[in-house]
């Protein structure tokens, strides 16, 4: 299990993934900007290596500390003289950080860790955070959506098979159920396909397919529907945190990538939802 998870996380260091993450560095920074400043110590949990984001944070005079299990990322951080913490150091940290930031990480913990592993991980983070500190979670999620059926049309025949390949993989991995395909009067699927399903299923399809097939093996195992009850269950209830704020993020840099695969004029759901959790003092 640990080997599989390590390989998965190492895949996040590939060039395509890092380029996309760096493209959205400004959005990652905006989610925490108001909390930063002198005498603030920030842990970027599951940091990856995003030089532009790190530069933005350190320019506020915040003490930035990265944490990532990837040996490749750790080497990049070390080569660039960026402060990072090891697993052993984090396990022994107590009341050390003012802010713990998880950007596009919570859904991975939900997808890859067992229940006991999650419990242990969040207890570790709780110990590392100062009293009255803040956990900020920025992750996938359609926000408050209804269970009503909606539809999405694939952009062209050129990408029809690619989108369908994603759907089959997501179904195989129990991330979604198979959506309905719109047919003509003779019950033949209309090409390019139009899919009908609930909002959460369409959200999963859209934001997975946008990565391209090179990311299929990795991303098709992950659910992108993060909703507040999961945060309540795993952090708030066991550790006494309160969600003080949540807001939707619409990152327009995703639009041209989405339009390659789907006929849309704008982004129909948030690209991320940002949750702020306050620890009891």
Where are these regions (language model features)?
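Short glycine-dipeptide loop
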Residues: 129-135
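Short alpha-helix
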Residues: 221-239
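A short, conserved alpha-helix within the catalytic core of class I
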Residues: 109-124
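Core SAM-dependent methyltransferase catalytic element
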Residues: 259-281
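Class I SAM-dependent methyltransferase SAM/SAH-binding core
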Residues: 43-91
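Class I SAM-dependent methyltransferase Rossmann-like catalytic core
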Residues: 1-35
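A conserved beta-strand element that flanks and buttresses the S-adenosyl-L-methionine
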Residues: 101
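Conserved class I S-adenosyl-L-methionine
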Residues: 136-199
């Amino acid at each position: 299990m640990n080997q599989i998870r390590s390989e998965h996380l190492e895949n996040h260091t590939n060039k395509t993934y890092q380029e996309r993450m760096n493209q959205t560095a400004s959005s990652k920074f905006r989610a925490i900007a108001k909390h930063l400043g002198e005498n603030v110590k920030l842990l970027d949990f599951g940091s990856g290596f995003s030089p532009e984001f790190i530069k933005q944070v350190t320019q506020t005079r915040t003490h930035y500390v990265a944490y990532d299990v990837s040996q490749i990322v750790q080497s990049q951080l070390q080569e660039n003289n960026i402060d990072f913490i090891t697993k052993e150091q984090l396990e022994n940290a107590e009341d050390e950080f003012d802010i713990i930031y998880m950007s596009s990480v919570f859904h991975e913990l939900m997808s890859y860790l067992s229940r006991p592993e999650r419990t242990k991980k969040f207890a570790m983070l709780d110990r590392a955070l100062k009293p009255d500190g803040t956990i900020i979670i920025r992750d996938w999620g359609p926000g408050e959506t209804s269970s009503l059926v909606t539809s999405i049309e694939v952009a062209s025949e050129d990408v029809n098979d690619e989108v369908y390949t994603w759907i089959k993989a997501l179904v195989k991995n129990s991330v979604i159920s198979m959506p309905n395909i719109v047919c003509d009067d003779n019950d033949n699927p209309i090409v390019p396909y139009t899919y009908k399903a609930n909002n959460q299923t369409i959200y999963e399809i859209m934001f997975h397919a946008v990565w391209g097939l090179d990311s299929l093996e990795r991303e098709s195992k992950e659910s992108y529907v993060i909703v507040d009850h999961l945060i309540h269950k795993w952090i708030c209830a066991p550790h006494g945190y309160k969600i003080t704020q949540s807001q939707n993020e619409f990152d327009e840099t995703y639009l041209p990538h989405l339009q390659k695969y789907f006929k849309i004029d704008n982004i129909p759901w948030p690209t991320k939802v940002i949750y702020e959790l306050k620890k009891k003092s």
